[in-house]
Amino acid sequence: MDFRIGQGYDVHQLVPGRPLIIGGVTIPYERGLLGHSDADVLLHAITDALFGAAALGDIGRHFSDTDAAFKGADSRVLLRECAARVKAAGFTIQNVDSTVIAQAPKLAPHIDGMRANIAADLGLPLERVNVKAKTNEKLGYLGRGEGIEAQAAALLVKAGA
């Protein structure tokens, strides 16, 4: 079997005046993530993990932050397009595991919705998608609440392998 593992990472600054969208879920909070698209840090990390596992580059290669077409883009749409490109390259997505690091707000009440969105967008059963939430124990820029970070891992298998 031809297995491929990909790792993804993203971080965005928290700023006033933007919605906070993580895993396709809008979370009530006084600040949101700054970015060219909707700045969904979790979906961006997963997208990078999938592209990386398939050796297709990264999110910026496919959805450039200098391209006006992606200004304000819904990251769920980008994730679905990523999945289509990975499948077109001959891979089947096996599972995704991810971690969101945020001092605030509390993400636990929103994890089920995030998992459901990701599973739906990737065409996976819910039990193949995991999202964990951690704080940074008040250390560094994440601990000071200046941003939110996400990390993801994805496993692909070459179709027919």
UniProtKB/Swiss-Prot annotation:
It catalyses: 4-CDP-2-C-methyl-D-erythritol 2-phosphate = 2-C-methyl-D-erythritol 2,4-cyclic diphosphate + CMP. A divalent metal cation binds at residues 10, 12, 44. Homotrimer. Belongs to the IspF family. Pathway: Isoprenoid biosynthesis; isopentenyl diphosphate biosynthesis via DXP pathway; isopentenyl diphosphate from 1-deoxy-D-xylulose 5-phosphate: step 4/6. NCBIfam families: ispF (TIGR00151). 4-CDP-2-C-methyl-D-erythritol 2-phosphate binds at residues 10-12, 36-37, 58-60, 63-67, 144. Its EC number is 4.6.1.12. Binds 1 divalent metal cation per subunit. SUPFAM superfamilies: IpsF-like. GO terms for biological process: isopentenyl diphosphate biosynthetic process, methylerythritol 4-phosphate pathway; terpenoid biosynthetic process. Its cofactor is a divalent metal cation. Involved in the biosynthesis of isopentenyl diphosphate (IPP) and dimethylallyl diphosphate (DMAPP), two major building blocks of isoprenoid compounds. Catalyzes the conversion of 4-diphosphocytidyl-2-C-methyl-D-erythritol 2-phosphate (CDP-ME2P) to 2-C-methyl-D-erythritol 2,4-cyclodiphosphate (ME-CPP) with a corresponding release of cytidine 5-monophosphate (CMP). This is 2-C-methyl-D-erythritol 2,4-cyclodiphosphate synthase. The record marks 36, 135 as: Transition state stabilizer. Keywords: Isoprene biosynthesis, Lyase, Metal-binding. GO terms for molecular function: 2-C-methyl-D-erythritol 2,4-cyclodiphosphate synthase activity; metal ion binding.
